[in-house]
Amino acid sequence: MAAQEVLLVTTPEPTALVDAYAMVKVVHLRDSQKPLWLLINNAQNQEEAEETIEQLQSATKRFLNRELNVLGMLPTDPFILQAVRQQRGVVDLFPQSPAAMALHAAARQLQEKIPLQKDGFAAFWKGLSTEGL
């Protein structure tokens, strides 16, 4: 994989959790050292997001002996549907909406925790050339 970090976005639905775990497993088998970040989308509340995180963390720890870096959650937000209908980003169209605020918080957290790499683009191309498309 050419990416140096992996951001996994999933929802609380059981089928989505199965898919998310499958993706974690694929990434882990290809590169067990690659950092994995988890963001829960469309959570009804903080409790639902935390339960979802715990379920995925538990399976990942138990079967892969691996921890996920948790970014947090994006709440269910009616402004997202409005933005989709207008074919615009929720952050641009409704910057004060709960989803936009949560996206900003997740982006800030990523910025703080992932060092900016000056050779990021070069590393990307090197990854493509050595790992294939």
List PLM regions with ranges.
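Inter-motif core of Ras-like GTPase G domains
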Residues: 1-15, 24
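Signal for well-folded cores of large energy- and translation-related assemblies
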Residues: 25-28, 44, 61, 75, ...
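NTP-binding/hydrolysis catalytic cores, primarily Walker-type P-loop NTPases
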Residues: 89-133
